[in-house]
Amino acid sequence: MNPYVLMILLSSLGLGTTLTFASSHWLLAWMGLEINTLAITPLMAQHHHPRAVEATTKYFLTQATAAAMILFASTTNAWMTGEWSITDLSDPLANTMFMTALALKIGLAPMHFWMPEVLQGLDLLTGLILSTWQKLAPFALIIQTAQNIDPLLLTLLGVTSTLVGGWGGLNQTQLRKILAYSSIAHMGWMIIVIQYAPQLTLLALGTYIIMTSAAFLTLKMSLTTKVSTLATTWSKSPILTATTALVLLSLGGLPPLTGFMPKWLILQELTKQDLPIIATTMALAALISLYFYLRLCYAMTLTISPNTTNSTTPWRTQTTQASMPLALFTMATLGLLPMTPAILTLTT
């Protein structure tokens, strides 16, 4: 892609998200979401491949449907209450419609069906943008309106997403689909606590973005997209293989890695709110997710691929890929748990 076009598209992504962040009027927020969608569409279709075009088409149709629902919900709310302000979403029908539309936008279960298929058709860097940056603007709107939305709807979306994210990833052989189901499960953790402690949702979103960025960058560095090729990565780069395994365990929420922090705090908050059954369900759903992360780690570090020839290990050769972003995200993914008290002080 032409670098000038790429710069314009990335700037438009930033502009759309910033516009949604800064707006208090429904039409401006909707416009920001649409700029985001239109900016990422050419990035998704830049590789002239049938799968990429199919993924782009699915994504565009899904986002257009969600955008139409948001516009309809906001006009319904304005018709019933006379208010266009985002925080004055008081009509029950508009509330439900709006939350359903945003759930479709970020891929919450049961509106998640597009997410694994779209992510599978993209390259890893575009998939990274879709899994991280594209979640920011919808979450800004959800956080602003969470207190007006039916708590039962939020709880159902959260529990369903964590269960579907766990079950869906169990039998997958494609790493991008596994990361898509991982994203769905993490979205569920954020939504379940948003009505009780929005600052914990922001903390979970921040750690999710860091961990997912580290996962995508490590997989891109090792040139791996399938579980079957994970077994060959140790001969190419043993250190990168060990790092990838730790990043995946952090995504699964295993202590003492960073991913344990948001899950622990969210379970603590749910218990404080006298919701032990929901907290137990979420913890068990996290165990299901942890299984497929452990399966990936087993394939990477505890299996040896068939090798009949005595070949020299290529891991001493210099890599041509940029490793600074990978190093930063990996360090944050593995080592932020001891800083939990400081992070809580900053977020509360």
UniProtKB/Swiss-Prot annotation:
E.C. no: 7.1.1.2
Keywords: Electron transport, Membrane, Mitochondrion, Mitochondrion inner membrane, NAD, Respiratory chain, Translocase, Transmembrane, Transmembrane helix, Transport, Ubiquinone
Membrane topology: Multi-pass membrane protein
InterPro entries to which the protein is assigned, alphabetical: Complex_I_Subunit_2 (IPR050175), NADH_DH_su2_C (IPR010933), NADH_UbQ_OxRdtase_chain2 (IPR003917), ND/Mrp_TM (IPR001750)
Location in the cell: Mitochondrion inner membrane
UniProt GO BP: mitochondrial electron transport, NADH to ubiquinone
Membrane-spanning intervals of the chain: 3-23, 60-80, 96-116, 149-169, 178-197, 202-219, 246-266, 274-294, 326-346
Catalytic activity field: a ubiquinone + NADH + 5 H(+)(in) = a ubiquinol + NAD(+) + 4 H(+)(out)
Keyword Acyltransferase: no
GO molecular function: NADH dehydrogenase (ubiquinone) activity
Main location: mitochondrion
Top-level taxon in the UniProt lineage: Eukaryota
GO cellular component terms given for this protein: mitochondrial inner membrane
Protein function: Core subunit of the mitochondrial membrane respiratory chain NADH dehydrogenase (Complex I) that is believed to belong to the minimal assembly required for catalysis. Complex I functions in the transfer of electrons from NADH to the respiratory chain. The immediate electron acceptor for the enzyme is believed to be ubiquinone.
Protein family (similarity comment): Belongs to the complex I subunit 2 family.
Full protein name: NADH-ubiquinone oxidoreductase chain 2
Native species: Carassius auratus
Gene from which this protein is expressed: MT-ND2
